[in-house]
Amino acid sequence: MGPCLRRGTATGLAMYNLLSGLSVIEASSFVASPTAGLYCAQFGAEVIRVDQIGGGPDFRRWPVTAEDDSLYWENLNRAKKSVALDLGRPEGRELLQALVRATGQFVTNFPVGGFLSHATLAEGRPDLITVRVMGWPDGSPALDYTVNNSVGYPMLTGPGPEPVNHVLPAWDLLTGAYAAFALLAATQRRGATGEGGEVRLPLSDVAIGTVANMGGLAEVLYSGENRPRLGNAVYGLFGRDFTTRDRVRTMIVVVTPRQWANLIAALNLGDAIATIEATRGVSFATDDGLRFTHRDALYPLFERAIAARDHADLAAAFDAGGIVHSPYRTMLDAANDPALVANNPIFGAADNPSGFAYPAAGAFATVPQMERQAPRPAPRNGQHSEEVLSERLALPAGEIARLIDAGVVGVG
């Protein structure tokens, strides 16, 4: 049996139809696993999210509106269909199992064992692909905010000495993207071999594996010590926050020799830099590492030069020189930036379940050869229950009505 081809049509259009014909059942909550489904849906897959009637544990997660509608939920679940079942009852669990078997692709963060174990689901569907997001490899729970602590980043973040958590659930988001990638890799393998299987993706492995890929493990094992706390400075190159004369705090990062030369010229620091180079016997022209190593001499020089200029003046000079910079601003500032949001083609209007109208993000990637469609809204809980049970399980209308009356199936 191959991947289940779409038989129904979701409301509206996909952002792109690159995954048209691929259907996925998703039973998940919080960030990582729903993100995998979101990315698949944005590229045209039919993603059917199955939840408890009334919503899962993240259905009212903050931020919420005054009416308690989750803005978080309605953005992480855009472009999906919704089936609501009473998963506390055997009949509801059996319906979910049947949907998974009928579809052939399953993304979840439910535990390895139990009624959604791969072994149980693969009975009668040996080519089933299950992608299971986990906390730790042994099945114990974890969250982004605890895994982040475990791999050491809070002890690198901020100026010290106390650990500093970052507020972006980066490991969740990276895990979700990797889960979507793993799903497509597994379908590619099945297309070549006919074999299904389970992919287990622990959040902790994504985190520590990423640390390793960035050279972090090798660095500390080679040196035998931890990297120093640098605040907002960038490790290994010239990059830091500075404050202008009109009190605008801006981040400046230099990654090429040309940018370095243009930064020096924009701030008229050629002679001062030459003096430091002569005194210390180094050249900063092409060496990121030397600029970082000698930051004790360079930072004060740049602090004074930048503090003597207004931000608008500096920004114009930096833009002319191709220097990478950006002022710090609030998320509300970002939301009101026309270039970033209002005039950005990844955003569009959607009929959101909350009733609140705001720019909705579609696929982040742009495919110039294809027309981008508007983002689709998130579904209401149970909005597609009748449609999916009819089309995917071939249940007659009378049987679906019985299940609804019995409280096994919910409709939105």
Spans of model-derived segments:
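C-terminal core of ALDH-fold dehydrogenases
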Residues: I306-P368
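Mid-domain beta-loop-alpha active-site segment that forms a flexible
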Residues: V167-L184, L203-N213, V255, Q259
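Oxidoreductase and adenylate-handling cofactor-binding alpha/beta cores
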Residues: G176-G197, N213-V220, I264-I276
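N-terminal helix-loop segment corresponding to the beta1-alpha1 unit
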Residues: L5, A10-E195, A312, R380, ...
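Flexible, small-/acidic-enriched active-site or ligand-binding loops
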Residues: D351-R402
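Short Gly/Pro-enriched turn/cap motifs at secondary-structure boundaries
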Residues: W73, N226-V234, R240-D241, I252, ...
